[in-house]
From Swiss-Prot:
Designated name of the protein: FHF complex subunit HOOK-interacting protein 1B
Family the UniProt entry places it in: Belongs to the FHIP family.
Modification Phosphoserine, positions: S467, S510, S523, S529, S533, S863, S900
Presence of the UniProt keyword Repeat in the record: no
Annotated organism of origin: Mus musculus (Mouse)
UniProt keyword list: Phosphoprotein, Protein transport, Transport
Length: 975
């Protein structure tokens, strides 16, 4: 993840001593101190004769006087820069400096030169010369000049003169910023000097002045090295303000620093390209190499990086003010409308920008304000998060960018994000049958879930070669419910940042003459594949590495992912295990109430204090907080009632004591454990649903008022442009609002997952990666919802197992209708493997990459965005990859060539126009790719379910934590 490390780079940009630029200074010939002092006094005596005249133009040769003073001053300051303290008094000033302080040399010369500004001739040139001389003196001096008051007063007088209305020029701006930068470096070495530059108010009631700071602020958003120097200098002052309450209060209360930063971000964002030139079909996020060449975006990222660094080091008053200004001056008025543009290209660009910002920010306070904006800010009655969730069901490009954004959000491991997306709908436990609630916390110790997932691999996607006799090993694989997998081991070096489902395409296979991999450690009991059999090794023209025996790699990758989530979630406020936070007790059976028990006035209070509650425990209000409820944000501004997942779950006011509820639940689970009770409950539910939810018993709630029905309709079908957005509703068709609902996020993910055959290969990679990312979380509610294949859900709740089963049936149906499906599948695997190997290649070099150690290869392997989800920029690489599997340019068919460009197996397509043939070719290509990805996704889910069984948040090895990359997780968002 790209993180901002401004401070680590700052030292290299601010050296201790600098060679002055452009002054044409000659290295003085050092003489003895007495001679230097004599020469210094001689120059000063000649200057004094000119200064003691009545005015700048009293003599006829006024211009000559100005030139003479400039030359003598240059000689004196050159000598003064080389002056050193005498050995007898090492802490005192040197002889030249002592003489200059006694005569107040700097102030007298500067005052005389500033008198020439009244005539308006050559002011810019003189000011630039003055700045250059003082900068040379400050940077080259061998004594701490700033400790002496006369030197500081002269510098402040010069900085004050720079605030007068003088025509600006590049030389003048460069000289001013350079001098200020050198002063900041000196002050950073001696922080006690900072408050000496803070001038008292010129008159009662006025604000104090810190010219060292205020003169830098106008350059904070400047381009090029000038702006970079100004930001570096300001950052040094920000770091010093943390230890100086006086300076911190000045910056927060008497300067425009924070408003300038926030409004500058808004102005810079308005100059960003509204349409991103997409480099390829697999593009889904902005990497550094994408935006570094765009000047407007590079300048914005530099300013955002600076804001991140300021919040990291500045005084708490400055931090809070800057965060508030960014939220209210940039996110709400600029990012909010930008994310809701009507043009699809603009929506793609704004979503990609937002994902880049979230991925680049490293300071928690700034990250929190971005998340607060996403979770709580409403635009046209919808939260930003609701809008982004809906876009997952849109066209391919907008869907990919949205999936990439949610991948970044989940990587933050923020409790409030997951609570808002999924957990608040699962906390009431209405998605499971009442008798199944105790099973939420069950751990699958025998691999039954893994066995179930692996059994969903379509038969047409399995390797059917005969296997050698299975060795008799005493291992877990021989136990009941253990997975048995046809597989063939493939060598790779696992990498935590690479999703394991991509390991299929990133192996070093025996393609194109590459060396054969060594044996891979095999778990006892896993079926040996024909590929690893000594009696038979397939040729490269056969199955590409067989890709069947990579389950051990998935297990390693899953263990890393689960451990990472466990460590990142340790600071969360609740384990979300079905008891904490406690679901609302319901004495009426499995048909729970769908309305909040809050009175209307309490709902209004909750709505008013919604954003403030985010500071204490995010969206989850603790027991000690006033309302005492788990507060999901309102939907479309309507406080309720909503589906069960969106209702408010009581934490403090309870109908039954907590101990009684636990006994009631335990007793209920025991009474309902029998098959009769369970079957009777299912029958009752079936009868109730067949009658439209109405039975002989009175309804549990009155019907929704018309205005609330309208609000609910507006939520389920948001008033956005229909084309690029929802291809499937957030709720299934004919689903009643009173039925259990697992949330729009899971609904749109499952709907997209169910249409895997229609998705592009890149959408499926991002989609399956997002689901696997969710499955790695250790919260029992989420883990059981996704991975517990024995859990019985409510009839209206679709499980992941059902979705995967539907995809399996579609793949098998497609394979049965496609005569050459095995050949298509083999070609698709070869293409994806070749694509992965090309993206791992060493950049633009034409020759083969030299062999290197595994550790070096592991250290440079790119991330997800740089692997398969990455366009092959090099024409050579693109040509190599396109030979394997690409749709025909003329629309005549789907080219499925093997290794040579001319060898292809055309797919027989129906007669019709070119557009119909191209559409059919695209449909076949997407379905074949899906048949490759789907089995690997099932292996990944199976491995994750087994990793959960052996991972405990209390038993993690600390040594393992040290060896793995650091994880930054967020609990509830704090102010």
């Amino acid at each position: 993840m790209e993180k901002m490390n401004w401070l680590s780079r700052l030292a290299s940009r601010v050296p201790g001593h600098r060679v002055p630029q452009g002054a044409s200074l000659q290295t003085p010939v050092m003489a003895d101190p007495e001679t230097c002092l004599m020469v210094f006094k001689n120059h000063w005596s000649q200057v004094v004769r000119i200064l003691e005249r009545q005015g700048p133009r009293a003599a006829t040769g006024g211009a000559d006087d100005l030139s003479a003073v400039r030359n003598h001053t240059y000689q004196m300051l050159t000598l003064l820069a080389e002056d050193r303290a005498v050995p007898s008094a090492p802490s005192g000033p040197g002889p030249l400096l002592e003489f200059a302080l006694r005569e107040d040399l700097l102030s007298r010369v500067l005052t005389w030169q500033l008198q020439w500004d009244e005539f308006g001739d050559g002011v810019e040139e003189r000011r630039a010369e003055q700045l250059k001389l003082f900068e040379m003196l400050v940077s080259e001096a061998r004594q701490p000049l700033l400790r002496h008051g006369p030197v500081r007063e002269a510098l402040l007088a010069l900085l004050d003169a720079c605030g007068r209305p003088v025509p600006s020029s590049p030389a003048l701006d460069e000289g001013l910023v350079l001098l200020l930068s050198q002063l900041c470096v000196c002050v950073a070495r001696e922080p006690s000097l900072l408050e000496f530059f803070l001038q008292p108010p010129p008159e009662p009631g006025a604000a104090p002045r810190l010219l060292l700071f205020s003169r830098l602020v106008p350059f904070v958003h400047r381009e090029g090295t000038l702006g970079q120097q100004a930001r570096d200098a300001l950052l040094l002052l920000m770091a010093l303000s943390d230890g100086s309450p006086t300076v911190g209060r000045y910056i927060a209360d008497h300067s425009y620093f924070c408003p300038v930063l926030a409004t500058g971000l808004s102005a810079l964002y308005s100059s960003l390209p509204r349409k991103i030139e997409v480099p390829g079909d697999d593009w889904h996020c902005l990497r550094r190499e994408d935006w570094i060449g765009v000047p407007a975006l590079a300048l914005f990222m530099s300013s955002l990086e600076f804001c991140n660094a300021v919040i990291q080091v500045a005084h708490p008053l400055v931090q809070k003010q800057l965060v508030d200004y960014i939220h209210n001056g940039f996110l709400v008025p600029v990012m909010g409308p930008a994310l809701h543009k009507t043009s699809v290209e603009e929506m793609i660009a704004s979503t990609a920008y937002l994902e880049l910002f979230l991925r680049s920010i490293s300071e928690p306070a700034l990250l929190r304000t971005f998340l607060r904006f996403l979770l709580l800010h409403r635009h046209d009655t919808h939260t930003i998060l609701d809008t982004l969730v809906a876009r997952i069901g849109s066209n391919s490009r907008l869907c990919m960018v949205s999936l990439s954004l949610f991948r970044t959000l989940l990587n933050l491991s923020c409790e409030d994000v997951l609570l808002q997306l999924v957990l608040r709908y699962l906390v009431p436990c209405n998605h499971v049958m009442l008798s199944q609630k105790p099973a939420v916390r069950d751990v699958d110790l025998y691999g039954r879930a893994a066995d179930k997932f692996l059994s969903l691999i379509p038969r047409c996607c399995r390797h059917h070669a005969p296997s050698p006799p299975r060795p008799e090993h005493a291992s877990w694989a021989r136990g009941p419910g253990s997975p048995s997998v046809d597989s063939s081991s493939v060598v790779t070096v696992p990498r935590p940042s690479t999703p394991s489902r991509l390991a299929l395409f990133l192996r070093q296979q025996s393609l194109g003459g590459s060396e054969s991999p060594g044996p891979v450690p095999r778990s006892p009991g896993l079926t040996a594949s024909p590929t690893s059999s000594p009696s038979r090794r397939p040729s490269p023209a056969e199955e590409p590495g067989e890709l069947e025996d990579n389950y051990l790699e998935y297990l390693r990758e899953a263990r890393r992912g689960v451990d990472r989530c466990v460590r990142a979630c340790r600071t969360w406020s609740a384990p979300y295990d079905g008891e904490r936070p406690p679901p609302e007790p319901n004495p009426l059976g499995s048909r729970t109430k769908k309305r909040s028990l809050l009175p209307e006035e309490d709902r209004d209070n909750v709505r008013e204090g919604e954003e403030e509650n985010l500071g204490s425990r995010g969206l989850a209000v603790g027991v000690g907080d006033t309302p005492g409820y788990l507060l999901p944000p309102q939907l479309n501004g309507v406080p309720g009632p909503w589906p069960e997942g969106a209702k408010k779950v009581r934490l403090v006011p309870r109908l039954v004591p907590q101990e009684g509820v636990r006994e009631l639940l335990e007793g209920t689970s025991e009474d309902m454990a029998g098959l009769e009770s369970f079957g009777q409950e299912l029958q009752e539910l079936e009868v109730a649903l067949s009658n439209g939810g109405a039975g002989s018993e009175p309804p549990l709630e009155p019907p929704l008022p018309p205005e609330e029905e309208e609000a609910y309709e507006s939520f389920t079908c948001p008033p956005e442009p229909p084309g690029p957005f929802l291809s499937s509703p957030l709720r299934t068709l004919h689903q009643l609002p009173s039925q259990p609902f697992t949330g729009p996020f899971m609904a749109v993910l499952f709907a997209k997952l169910e249409n895997m055959l229609q998705n592009s290969v890149y959408v499926n990679f991002l989609l399956t990666g997002l689901v696997a990312q969710l499955a790695c979380h250790p919260q029992p509610l989420l883990r059981s919802f996704l991975l517990n294949t024995n859990m019985v859900f409510q009839p209206s709740v679709k499980s992941l197992l059902q979705v995967l089963g539907s995809v399996k049936n579609k793949i098998e149906s497609f394979a049965a209708s496609q005569e050459d499906f095995p050949a298509l599948l083999s070609k698709a695997k070869k293409y994806l493997i070749a694509r992965g190997k090309l993206d791992w290649a060493e950049g633009p070099t034409a020759g083969p990459a030299p062999r290197r150690s595994d550790s070096l290869v592991r250290s440079r392997r790119p991330s997800l965005g740089e692997l398969l989800l990455r366009h092959a920029h090099s024409p050579t690489r693109a040509r190599q990859a396109v030979q394997v599997l690409q749709p025909g340019r003329d629309g005549t068919g789907l080219g499925l060539g093997g290794g040579s460009p001319g060898a292809s197996t055309p797919v027989l397509l129906p007669r019709g126009g070119a557009s119909e043939r191209q559409g059919e070719a695209l449909r076949v290509k997407n379905a074949v790719y899906c048949a490759v990805i789907f089995p690997e996704f099932l292996k990944e889910l199976a491995a994750i379910s087994q990793a959960h069984a052996v991972t405990s948040p209390f038993l993690l090895d600390t040594s393992e934590e040290v060896s793995l990359p650091p994880i930054s997780g967020f609990g509830p968002l704090n102010p």
